[in-house]
């Protein structure tokens, strides 16, 4: 879950998780949380949250508290300069190197790709040969 640029980052991260670990994953815009998405949250729901945009961090942390209150385990990727609620129950927290908001796409995207990579390795999958994927562009 994320807002603005973070949502775009999550779309890519979700795709990578599907492609190489074969786990169903959906990216959700945090602002849409109360329009149906919240109904899917249970104690067994892992939630990946990305918070890198300075102007949106307070709203995003508020949305994260909502999913935590429903028992979801949250894996948080956040800009290292943001203040973390240490009393909240986090599954994992990954602090990303701080830079201009518009450039946070780079470390956040790489972090989500690494998440997909290590989940795949943990499942014993060959990340270099994902099944049923074909190159879109071929060179003759």
Which residues does each PLM region occupy?
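A SIS-like phosphosugar-recognition module
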Residues: 1-140
